[in-house]
């Protein structure tokens, strides 16, 4: 067994001899930085300057939320006012609604125009009726001329031409039919070109196969038949000439 080390207290004059006139304060490690003591006061807010996300950050978030809320309220009020005084159409159907409005506007203008012409119509009829007695004394062949002119002028004012315009639905239907016709024409053209290409490839392969069969002919000994090859070359030269 290993010898047991005796405790210092059993040594003669152990503790007393070691501690005579020596202070233990001077034996601290000077390389270790001493931690300063700070009282743990209760903080008024969560977080600190080093950790972040404290009082200033929470205040900033609160201000941002209030600002965004105010912007939403203003935007909502603005859209409600716009919806009262303006017509908002979807983007994909906007051109149809605008065309319909333009058509109604033109029709209203045409309706107002004939009304203003009808006001002048009685005046023209009165002029014609006044002019008739004056022309009765003249010759018979001169008499119908002013009446015809009056009738023509009255008819020209009273009978407006009715220009039947197409509705937006009819225009959309025509556009759709045109698009379908273009697509069908493109499809037919594609099919025609495809058939021509396949036919050309088939003819090319057939021709190549015939040439291969001619040039691949061999003699009984298994050697290439040069006579057949020379005949083929002469035939090609004659065709080119």
UniProtKB/Swiss-Prot annotation:
Tissue occurrence: Ubiquitously expressed. In lung, expression is restricted to the alveolar epithelial cells.
Gene Ontology molecular function terms on file: RNA binding
UniProt-listed InterPro entries: Fyv7/TAP26 (IPR013730)
Gene Ontology CC, one term: nucleoplasm
Region feature (Disordered): 1-22, 182-205
Biased composition (Basic and acidic residues): 186-202
Pfam families associated with the record: rRNA_processing
Main localization of the protein described in the UniProt heading: nucleus
Locations listed in the record: Nucleus
Keyword Flavoprotein: no
Keywords associated with the record: Nucleus, Transcription, Transcription regulation
Family membership noted in the UniProt record: Belongs to the TAP26 family.
Protein task: Component of the transcription complexes of the pulmonary surfactant-associated protein-B (SFTPB) and -C (SFTPC). Enhances homeobox protein Nkx-2.1-activated SFTPB and SFTPC promoter activities.
Assembly with partners or alone: Interacts with NKX2-1.
Name the record gives this protein: Thyroid transcription factor 1-associated protein 26
Species this chain originates from: Homo sapiens (Human)
Lineage per the UniProt record: Eukaryota, Metazoa, Chordata, Craniata, Vertebrata
Gene: CCDC59
